[in-house]
Amino acid sequence: ARRRRRHASTKLKRRRRRRRHGKKSHK
């Protein structure tokens, strides 16, 4: 269970970064 909670936290952080926008900017 603890491992799952840690993964969820990482997912939330990744969503905040919005990699999709960064990729568009790179183009």
From Swiss-Prot:
User: What biological-process terms (Gene Ontology) are attached?
Assistant: cell differentiation; chromosome condensation; spermatogenesis
Where is the protein localized? Nucleus; Chromosome
Annotated protein name in UniProt: Protamine-A
Q: Does the keyword Lyase apply?
A: no
Query: Under the cellular component aspect of Gene Ontology, which terms does the record hold?
Result: nucleosome; nucleus
Alphabetized GO MF terms: DNA binding
Q: Outline the segment boundaries, as ranges, of region: Disordered.
A: 1-27
Any idea what job this protein has? Protamines substitute for histones in the chromatin of sperm during the haploid phase of spermatogenesis. They compact sperm DNA into a highly condensed, stable and inactive complex.
